[in-house]
A protein has these predicted regions:
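Beta-propeller domain segments
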Residues: 4, 11, 84-241
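Acidic, Gly/Ser/Thr-rich repeat motifs that build Ca2+-stabilized beta-propeller blades
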Residues: 1-87, 123-139, 197-236, 259-281
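Conserved blade-ending motifs and adjacent loop-strand segments that build the rim/top face
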Residues: 238-259
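Surface loop/turn motifs at the tips and blade-to-blade linkers of beta-strand repeat domains
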Residues: 48-52, 58-62, 112-117, 194-196, ...
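Basic side chains
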Residues: 34, 69, 100-103, 119, ...
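Hydrophobic transmembrane alpha-helix bundles
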Residues: 50-62, 147-155, 174, 251-258
Length: 282
């Protein structure tokens, strides 16, 4: 499992989980299962599967880059992020569901492409006005991005044509040139990105609202950086206004707010453990 969501806040809600499924021998895809919310037993049933699959190749750096983050939209719609599984041709192909942000109808299972040109989006949060998605996305070596996705129009975020990172082996690839501009090639520039020189700070993995500050303030967790960033967003201009690091000393895979206790759960994968983050307002 890579991510989860609830269909609603009602006690009778269903829980949804995204995962990677091997649909054919050595061929994988994104899928979603769901179950009635039950604290004794969860009986998951298949809800959604991307029909195409990508053949896994064994290589020195076997990156899966699968996306798999879920977020509930108002009404009967769900957001699913997908990665490219290192199939560079997929993110720019409108006939493929890989390297995309998808909107899925919870009643019919029919999907719709929201944005294209993504590598591995694994942080996802819906803005307060419900018009934008805030996305954190793993780059290659460097080039991690914070992107703002407008839900009202399909836009292209450039991967693998444009990226501010480099390939892990330092080489070049015709199918993935990683040009150091998005706008020059007709793509949306990231609201924020981390260059190779900042590589020790990146690995952005999850997003949660910063409820202590309110407004458009968020907490963005990292893996390699062992940092949580406090970030202020201007959605109308697709900009990061302020960003400041907070050292936590662990790879934070996920961060979730507990409204009843007014603190955050940190899922720290290298310990492994669950941490608690509280805000000191003194």
């Amino acid at each position: 499992f890579s991510s989860g969501a609830f269909e609603s806040k009602r006690p009778t809600s269903k829980i949804l989980k995204a995962y990677i499924e091997e649909v054919e021998n050595d061929c994988v895809t994104n899928a979603i299962v769901r179950a009635d919310l039950n604290f004794e037993y969860l009986n998951f049933e298949k809800f959604y599967t991307i029909e195409e699959c990508v053949i896994r190749s064994v290589s020195p750096f076997n990156a899966h880059q699968s996306g798999g983050k879920l977020a509930k939209l108002p009404g009967d719609e769900l957001i699913l992020t997908t990665g490219d599984f290192r199939a560079y041709e997929k993110p720019q192909d409108m006939n493929s569901k890989f390297g995309k942000i998808l909107k899925i109808n919870l009643n019919t299972g029919i999907d719709e492409i929201i944005s294209i040109g993504h590598r591995n989006p694994q942080g996802l949060f819906l803005s307060d006005n419900m018009e934008y998605l805030l996305i954190s996305e793993h780059g290659p070596k460097g080039g991690d991005e914070i992107n703002i996705v407008n839900l009202k129009k399909v836009q292209n975020y450039g991967w693998p044509i444009s990226s501010y990172g480099t390939h892990y082996d330092g080489g070049t690839r015709t199918e993935a040139p990683l040009y150091k501009s998005h706008e020059s090639y007709g793509f949306v520039e990231p609201a924020w990105y981390f260059e190779y020189e900042q590589n020790d700070l990146h690995g952005i993995s999850a997003i949660e609202k910063d409820y202590s500050l309110g407004g458009n303030n968020y907490l963005i967790a990292t893996l390699k950086g062992n940092i949580i960033y406090e970030v202020e967003i201007d959605f109308n201009n697709s900009e990061v206004i302020n960003i400041s690091p907070m050292k936590v000393g662990a790879r934070v895979r996920d961060i979730e707010y507990d409204i009843d206790n007014d603190f955050y759960y940190l899922i720290m994968e290298n310990t492994p453990s669950i941490g608690i983050l509280t805000k000191n307002n003194k």
